[in-house]
Amino acid sequence: MVKVGFVSLGCNKNLVDSEIMMGACKEAGFEITPNAEDADVIVINTCGFINDAKQESIDTILEMAEYKNKKCKFLIVTGCLSQRYKDDILKELPEVDAILGVKEMLKLPNVIKKLYEGESKLQVFDDKPTFVYTSSMPRLIATPKFYAYIKIAEGCNNRCSYCSIPLIRGNYTSRYIDDIIQEARKLSEDGYKEIVLTAQDTTKYGIDIYQKKMLATLLQKLSEIDNIKWIRFLYSYPEDIDDELLNIVKSLPKVVKYFDIPIQHINNRILKLMNRKTSSEGIKELIQRIRSAFDEVVIRTTVMVGFPTESEDEFEELYEFVKWAKFDRLGAFMYSQEEGTPAADLPQTDDETKVKRYERILNLQRKISLERNRKRISKKYEVVIEGRDRNNFYIARSQFEAPEVDGKIIVFSKRKLLPGEFVVVKILDAFEYDLVGEVI
């Protein structure tokens, strides 16, 4: 039996795509292996969002190509990098045997068969509208047994001036609510306790097919499914977080009190240049509304430094805003010039300035994170055990930590704990990103 190995790079949305391709391959009779050295075929699902991600994708392709000197017969590249640079990959990377676009993932088993039949240098792309998966498609979940992602929409209509995702993924296309509910029910029946909703923009869910935002309705329906303990949604846009959504999050116990809101910047001129649909005043007002609506809530954000023409004063405005907002979690990016985007044609900020601003923001956030975490000492939280770390301590998350992107809670326990088990811990100590607690 042909063994197929997968490497999934980038975001959780890409991971869902990898899970669908793994499911399609398994259904077609291939064996899925987690070990590249055992694979007859290696599939790399690439990321192409920013320059660092592109470089990681290229480095991974070259690393996996080394296995062609051993057991691996074919190397296949798919994902955002292949969609964006389909004319360059086969030419510049002769080790690659086939490339697929982001809309052709279900064709992967057929591509593998064609390679075994003697075809080579295959390019499989389609100009059809955005691909959206359904609950009836095969999917092999790669996350631990206690949480799973559900991609509720594909593509993006926001057209931020720095972002190439709409060029790669197409227009915003929602899945139907009934189909999402069907998938969530199946996950619940299979034992998954946490559902994480993801999309390029979860807060615009439903606008294209229902002519109104339907995330609040979706959360309500998901909360009615038995055995699901936590429901989380990521990638919220500030202009779409309204009172209806806040009230739903507040009123539904299963919906975690956690908001992931990438704001990118706070200066109004920069926001306008970014083609963001919000304002400094709107962002500040939203943060105050969220914090006043909940007894305890976590806000995560992402900011970008070094955007074209960003002045020192405009960066200082962002810096002072971060100091004021005291985000629980903050990710920072240095602006990446993406060809084909409006921002790429603006006067660019030099790399040295970008690095300095990036480091200043991260140093500030480390202090804020420690301050926020220390406020959690002596509090009690229900957590899910994820496993053990290299020191054999248990690691866990509460509702206030999203999987993969946030810190962890190191847990001491006198009894044996199992991955996926929910226990209550008391927080004993705090660090910049992690907490320490004991089972009570």
UniProtKB/Swiss-Prot annotation:
Chain ranges of the TRAM domain: 374-440
Single GO BP term: tRNA modification
Record-listed [4Fe-4S] cluster 1 binding positions: C11, C47, C80
Record EC number: 2.8.4.4
Cofactor: [4Fe-4S] cluster
Keywords: 4Fe-4S, Cytoplasm, Iron, Iron-sulfur, Metal-binding, S-adenosyl-L-methionine, Transferase
Reactions accelerated catalytically: L-aspartate(89)-[ribosomal protein uS12]-hydrogen + (sulfur carrier)-SH + AH2 + 2 S-adenosyl-L-methionine = 3-methylsulfanyl-L-aspartate(89)-[ribosomal protein uS12]-hydrogen + (sulfur carrier)-H + 5'-deoxyadenosine + L-methionine + A + S-adenosyl-L-homocysteine + 2 H(+)
GO CC, any one term: cytosol
Compartments it resides in: Cytoplasm
Binding positions for [4Fe-4S] cluster 2 per the UniProt entry: C156, C160, C163
Lineage: superkingdom: Bacteria
Domain Radical SAM core: 142-371
Function (record text): Catalyzes the methylthiolation of an aspartic acid residue of ribosomal protein uS12.
HAMAP family (UniProt xref): MTTase_RimO (MF_01865)
Name of protein: Ribosomal protein uS12 methylthiotransferase RimO
